[in-house]
Amino acid sequence: MTRIIDSLAEIAQDYDVLFCDLWGCVHNGKVAYPAAIAALQDFRRGGGKVALMTNAPRPRRAVAAQIAALDVPEDAWDDIVTSGDAAQDAMFSGRVGRRVWHVGAEKDLSFFTDTPDPRAAAITRVAPAEAEGVVVTGLFDDMTETPADYHAALSEAAGRGLPLLCANPDIVVDFGEQRLYCAGALAQLYEQLGGEALYFGKPHAPIYDLARRRLGVSGGRELAIGDGIGTDIAGAVAQGIDSIFVTGGLAAEHMGGNVERPEDALLADWLKAEGLAPTYAIGRLR
């Protein structure tokens, strides 16, 4: 049964490593959460290691710059591991061919360029008709578009049998008060249209393996933290590690209106419907 806690400090002594989600836990895309930052700093001061693990489609250097601009200090984390990092390696390995149709915003171009990997030179972005595969980092304009805007183009690509690499398995994200679609929503549509989608972020294994390599750990007392039941919590369950579900993020509307602490009965009913049982739940990371 999921235990509701009031702070990370209540259980911190039981863990050596945190895999902590960023968006919805440490910031909301516009502002950082000071209490979450303080909790991570305290964990590290106690000797723990923190990997900020995000399904952002961009390499870690771009994400580091983003969170620095939001005033997330470097002493709150040991490393940043992104879905983009894991997916980038797969793309450079030729998993979806060398000539790819890129679906995503200009801000995501670092996915193709921000790397010392010499294999990057072999990847060429081309028009859909010339592509051997599809690389989705997001929507072209996530502020105004929905997956429905891509139905025709993705249907054609799926009909040609093009594999699709999804650089961000998230379906939606909250940007301030606005909910936006992510690359995962397009990959989901692609599969519904009969296409093949490849995933590398949470809840899939490659991003956890990469995080462990970067932290220099090989299992043990690990704890995952996140507000995505189908990504953060599902990933923790698949990895066989404990988790904290942050209920004041994506699932806040189902928890009784109090983002600081979920209502016990509502949480239990919702988790039962989702078919997942995180070890702990907390309103906001603190």
Regions found by a protein language model. Name each.
Residues 2-20, 27-46, 61-81, 85-286:
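Asp-based, Mg2+/Mn2+-dependent phosphohydrolase catalytic module
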